[in-house]
Amino acid sequence: MPTENVHGDSRLSLWLRVREYAVPASMIETATARRSAGDWAGACAAAGVDVDLDLRFLARSRGSELAARIRADLRHLAPDLLRWHLPRIAPDGLLRPGLTSTLARYDTAAGDDPHAVHTVHLVARTAPAWADGGQRISLALWDGSRSGQGRWGNPRHGPRPDRRFRLDLHRHLWDARRTDELRVRSGADRPPAEVLPPLDPELLAAPPQGHRCAVDRWAAEAGILLRAEGRTTGSVAVRLGARQRLVLDLAADGPGPPAARIGAAPADGSASALPVLPDAAVWTLPDLDLIRTGAVEAGRLHPLVASALVPDHAPTGPAGTADRAGQPRLVECRGARHRIGLVDGVLAALDHDPAEIRREELLAALTGTPLPCLRAIDAAHRRPDCLTGVRERLDHGDVAGALTVVEGLLGPDALLRAGALRDELEAAALRRITYGLFRAGLAGPGPGRIHPGAHRPREHRPHPRQAHAR
């Protein structure tokens, strides 16, 4: 059956997997508890966020006022929510690699000139694709200078923030104080069947076929962007992909709010200088689509997202299924139904005596055919049914979740055998090592550095080929 028939479209299929694996409930719970206790650094650690800034050094070098403003924002940063909303790419829904996204901007006086303004950015960064093991995020400061503090101060690893993926105008996507704004900014405050205000027909026809663009919100979001630039009307650029862009003109027509229309691209090539509508404002919020199509229940979303999109939703704690870890499983063995289960921390055949097991293992070592129970145990070690879920968790950095699944199947004392499962765990460990070398400046393009290894293979992934990422 086509993906479109199962999940509405391939985009929803992609986001279903992302919401299931990318930000596990255990991460949300731990990060929330630490943030609520005032431990913002601990919350970042729980959410897989590396902190590459030193507030004490900042206070000495730039002044205590700037450091206090940044500290206030960090105390309310929900790093798990930031991970939830950061841009992702198809086909696996991983974080967009090599991204530098502005979370907040701080204007400070530059030197002795009271009229000169210097802007410091609080940014979130993702590693390049070849070093994305663990899907970790970094927090840093960027001020446009070639000097800086911490690992990311190096210009090679500290690129200019991407205007397309800025989040300083969308603080509700990471600031716990403003998450209620998500309902209005996503359009969730309007019923799906509500008649939209009249829009320019050319504007409605502009998005590519099959893309879920928030066209009805573009005028309001363009207004927010222009006001941040000190204007109320003007033109903004909208990027719909790598090869499709359009110019949106926001003009006042009468006493109402400014209306948006498709504008002509500047003939002098100045389109690149136009303000860029943030990517978070271009597309329909995936969580809203998932809820409205019935693909997920509010309880499976991030609690801050669920409370904003579905205000009458009562949090019931982490959703889960009955825990079958360690429960015996049935195997058809020589005309009978036998059990295999955990004994002393390893997976074993429960309905065969030890002497028979030793005899069958010796037979298998001599190239014979072992008992079906032993074949089932061997298959569980090499290529278990849960392999896809383990792989997804490892790819998204949830090593603890992946090991919990493996230990629930094979036992905590199991010795993994050669096969796909061990290969996936070893590959994940190597990717984490590569990330550590990158963080230390010991791997990456350049003389004297270890050349990046090949990226993880994709051919084994049964993902929709036409999946789209926000």
Regions found by a protein language model. Give the residues of each.
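N-terminal membrane-targeting/anchoring modules of bacterial envelope and secretion proteins
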Residues: 1-209, 214-216, 410, 415-470
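C-terminal structured domains
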Residues: 239-470
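Extended acidic, Ser/Thr- and Pro-enriched interaction/regulatory segments
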Residues: 160, 164-166, 170-273, 281-282
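Ordered hydrophobic segments in well-structured contexts
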Residues: 96-105, 118-123, 136-140, 235-237, ...
